[in-house]
């Protein structure tokens, strides 16, 4: 884990190494200050003049200023190192996530990945900053102060030998109890972020179903779980400072008593006021170093779980990766499913797809229909290798998709997914995801073919209109048409429309299909739809049921051979006829009412 994370230091290695060296210089200077101060006290006691003490006092000021300079420099380098490390770690983690397949994302969940990119990296950054500075400083101060206390205090400083083991035992006991709590709390952070993510992205649904109170309670429960675990941890950690203060202050009382008694009994020959003062000062430094060590242990304990979670992502191998010698060119848009079976998890009991044997020629238009959960989307996801098959093989252009360079394959397989996603930026910028080098004319042509120009031209800024995050400022049908235009700009060999016209009317749907046929005549098209009218002109139509191909044929053939297809077609035609009848009746009633009000023929 440590080796994995330390790889993110890279170009900040110099400042990372410089920080402990500067801290060492700071500590050495600090250790000299009580020693020089003791000599000044003894000089004053012996009646030395100001002139005699000036060299020692000047040296003391010089050492103090040098210590300050070392400390300030260490602070600067520490900040550069920790912030740079966090920046690199975020970059490495985000870059790793970009290589993940859908299966990897399913394993970690998007909310958990967000927590790791934010909260967990912040925790590791804080721990790293403490490790390269305070974790170096505290042990050095403890060792040097302990040594100097024995040099200056002799037997009086033996008290620290009793106190330090007691404090160490207490500290490790607290950490032993706190660590599993911190381990739990970060998993609960995932649940908290998931609640926020679901609520924000689904805000319109929440409000339309008046579920604000339910969502508030759900969020409050997740927040309360985090609070309760943190409170348990803080209750244990609260014992740390009182325990330390009691032990160290008790040690000070014993040192004052023993030191004063020794000064009085020996009349300053064995122990004097200067030695007592320096022993006391070194004791205070020991106290501060112990408190800093306890802070480090607490922070590292908290960050340890975060570090494991980050390392877990960095160490994860993408389930889908490029082969050693990838094929870089897709010959054509032919697709072959060779007895393909697939399940989303190796632990799943049933197959999502079962023994699919299908052959599609290049340029063919294939319609796919089926009930909810019939694995229509799963089938087409395998073509772009968003998932790998469990059994069998999928071939594009006669080559197994696992043998292609992923970028080369996906550049020739354009998908308009069931969930339409737009990104923050202008309409033109979103469309150019299909082709970054597309001219303005090509962008407008793709929008026209997708019937998106009908509403884009109505915006004051046209194609420079800003799209909010997730496309929240455009309707569902508008999003679908923009996503189709984006896919068209790629001019792929295979175009997949996964229920991508469900939010547009049948007239617009027909115009889009006509545009696709004329614009990409040689492109293989797979159209998943719920409306049979969207696929009835396809060369072949696949009827999916329970992860298998139930029937395949053209529209006329399926009306004769497939009961599912025939019933769906009849039902949809009936609903369409009833809808048109209702519209006509409503139109006639409106016209009659208008004529009556105006004193027209209907009134007569």
Question: Where is each model-derived feature located?
Answer:
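Hydrophobic alpha-helical transmembrane segments of ABC transporter permease domains
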Residues: 2, 10, 21, 25, ...
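Transmembrane helix-loop-helix hairpins at lipid-water interfaces of multipass membrane proteins
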Residues: 10, 16-73, 77, 150-155, ...
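Alpha-helical transmembrane segments of multi-pass membrane proteins
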Residues: 14-16, 22, 63-82, 133-140, ...
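Helix-loop-helix
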Residues: 46-58, 148-162, 171, 232-309, ...
């Amino acid at each position: 884990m440590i080796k994995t994370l330390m790889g993110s230091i890279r170009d900040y290695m110099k400042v990372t190494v410089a920080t402990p060296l500067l801290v060492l210089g700071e500590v050495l200077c600090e250790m000299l200050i009580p020693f020089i101060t003791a000599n000044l006290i003894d000089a004053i006691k012996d009646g030395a003049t100001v002139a005699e003490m000036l060299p020692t006092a000047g040296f003391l000021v010089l050492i103090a200023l040098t210590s300050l300079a070392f400390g300030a420099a260490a602070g600067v380098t520490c900040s550069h190192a920790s912030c740079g490390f966090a920046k690199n770690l975020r970059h490495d983690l985000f870059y790793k996530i970009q290589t993940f397949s859908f299966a990897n994302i399913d394993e970690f969940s998007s909310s958990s990945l967000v927590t790791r990119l934010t909260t967990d990296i912040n925790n590791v950054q804080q721990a790293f900053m403490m490790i390269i500075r305070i974790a170096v400083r505290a042990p050095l101060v403890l060792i040097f102060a302990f040594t100097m206390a024995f040099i200056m205090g002799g037997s009086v400083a033996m008290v620290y030998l009793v106190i330090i083991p007691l404090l160490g035992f207490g500290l490790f006991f607290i950490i032993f109890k706190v660590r599993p709590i911190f381990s739990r709390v970060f998993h609960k952070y995932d649940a908290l972020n998931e609640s926020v993510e679901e609520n924000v992205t689904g805000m319109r649904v929440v409000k339309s179903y008046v579920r604000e109170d339910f969502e508030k309670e759900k969020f409050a429960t997740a927040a309360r779980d985090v609070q309760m675990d943190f409170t348990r941890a803080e209750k244990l950690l609260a014992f740390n400072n009182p325990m330390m203060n009691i032990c160290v202050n008790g040690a000070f009382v014993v040192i004052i008593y023993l030191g004063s008694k020794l000064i009085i009994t020996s009349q300053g020959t064995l122990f004097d006021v200067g030695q007592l003062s320096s022993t006391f000062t070194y004791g205070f430094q020991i106290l501060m170093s112990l408190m800093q060590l306890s802070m480090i242990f607490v922070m590292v304990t908290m960050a340890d779980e975060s570090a494991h979670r980050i390392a877990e992502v960095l160490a994860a191998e993408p389930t889908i990766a490029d082969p050693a010698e990838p094929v870089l060119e897709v010959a054509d848009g032919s697709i072959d499913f060779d007895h393909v079976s697939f399940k989303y998890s190796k632990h799943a009991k049933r197959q999502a797809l079962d023994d699919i044997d299908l052959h599609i020629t290049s340029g063919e238009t294939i319609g796919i229909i089926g009930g909810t959960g019939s694995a229509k989307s799963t089938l087409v996801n395998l073509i772009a290798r968003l998932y790998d098959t469990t059994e069998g093989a999928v071939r594009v252009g006669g080559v197994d998709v696992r043998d292609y360079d992923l970028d080369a394959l996906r550049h020739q397989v354009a998908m308009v997914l069931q969930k339409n996603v737009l990104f923050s930026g202008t309409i033109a910028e979103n469309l150019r995801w299909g082709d970054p080098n597309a001219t303005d004319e090509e962008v407008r042509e793709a929008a026209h073919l997708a019937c998106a120009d009908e509403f884009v031209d109505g915006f004051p800024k046209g194609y420079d209109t800003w799209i909010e995050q997730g496309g929240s400022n455009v309707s569902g049908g508008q999003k679908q048409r923009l996503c189709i235009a984006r896919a068209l700009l790629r001019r792929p060999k295979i175009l997949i429309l996964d229920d991508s016209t469900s939010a547009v009317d049948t007239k617009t749907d027909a115009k889009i299909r006509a545009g696709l046929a004329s614009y990409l005549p040689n492109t293989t098209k797979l159209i998943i739809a719920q409306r049979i009218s969207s696929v009835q002109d396809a060369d072949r139509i696949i009827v999916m049921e329970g992860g298998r191909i139930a029937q395949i044929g053209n529209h006329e053939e399926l009306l004769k051979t497939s009961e599912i297809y025939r019933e769906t077609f009849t039902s949809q035609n009936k609903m369409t006829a009833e809808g048109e009848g209702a519209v006509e009746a409503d139109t006639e009633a409106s016209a009659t009412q208008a004529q009556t009000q105006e004193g027209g023929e209907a009134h007569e």
